């Protein structure tokens, strides 16, 4: 049985003094939790992976995505299932709109703004606002072009609202659907680093159309040069958002396939903007010419001269 003296605790005031007295004693170093160990075992990260993280903006997206995956999903036939697609606040919507207007080179729009919570609230109302902006601005533009003509009578063209709605919503849903199917097909052939869901692609396309709302309002200016400059600015901003977002999803594919995909995305976006400008704003110069009626005296004079 151990002696009583062996069970007594001894208080060590100075570790250095104790080590001097017992040089062969075993020491244990407990590091402070806030300090980073100087030496860590493990292989360093490759430069390629660091490039992917920098391009995709992977700061805290893994944690957010993990927490988002823990949410319980309701059946698709219930109202709660679709309610989750509109579960965003004003700050998130404004932040995503700002991201679509100020694209950051080398950063991914999905990873920075959408990945944690893709929504349909922003894309739905952006498309609705764009529809009315194009239709109303197109009517006002036609009115200003013919303003001052005695024979011109303004008639509102309400059919432009339905045409604009069909065009905008078809583009905002059918093009993402086709792109999502294409990416899924290519992902089965080539293991890509990045994959997007259908809702994420719809979200990207919806927010990328926001720049066309102020552009459509400024298209009222009856100057073709100004209109085309506005088209190029809007196309450059929104097209760069789409290109930088979807390039990481196709860059591991065949080089020609990747470039053809990005070029197709930009060309379809250009076709939408140019088509809207040409149809809704570039009206014919004169749809009707002033008609003149001949008086009886003029008819008699013409008969005598012949």
UniProtKB/Swiss-Prot annotation:
Region (Disordered): 14-62
Residue ranges with Polar residues bias: 15-29
Superkingdom as given in the UniProt entry: Eukaryota
Residue ranges annotated as Lumenal topological domain: 141-162, 222-227, 278-306
Regions that span the bilayer: 120-140, 163-183, 201-221, 228-248, 257-277
Bias type Acidic residues, positions: 50-59
Primary location group: Golgi
Keyword list, A-Z: Endosome, Glycoprotein, Golgi apparatus, Membrane, Transmembrane, Transmembrane helix
Topological relation to the membrane, as annotated: Multi-pass membrane protein
Glycosylation sites: 297
Topological domains annotated Cytoplasmic: 1-119, 184-200, 249-256
Any Gene Ontology biological process: vesicle-mediated transport
Compartments where found: Golgi apparatus, cis-Golgi network membrane; Golgi apparatus, trans-Golgi network membrane; Late endosome membrane
Keyword Ligase (UniProt): no
Matching InterPro entries: Yip1_dom (IPR006977), Yip5/YIPF1/YIPF2 (IPR039765)
Annotated GO MF terms: small GTPase binding
CC annotations in GO: Golgi medial cisterna; Golgi trans cisterna; late endosome membrane; trans-Golgi network
Quaternary structure and partners: Interacts with YIPF6; this interaction may stabilize YIPF1. May also form a ternary complex with YIPF2 and YIPF6.
Family the entry assigns: Belongs to the YIP1 family.
Name of this chain's protein: Protein YIPF1
Source species: Pongo abelii (Sumatran orangutan)
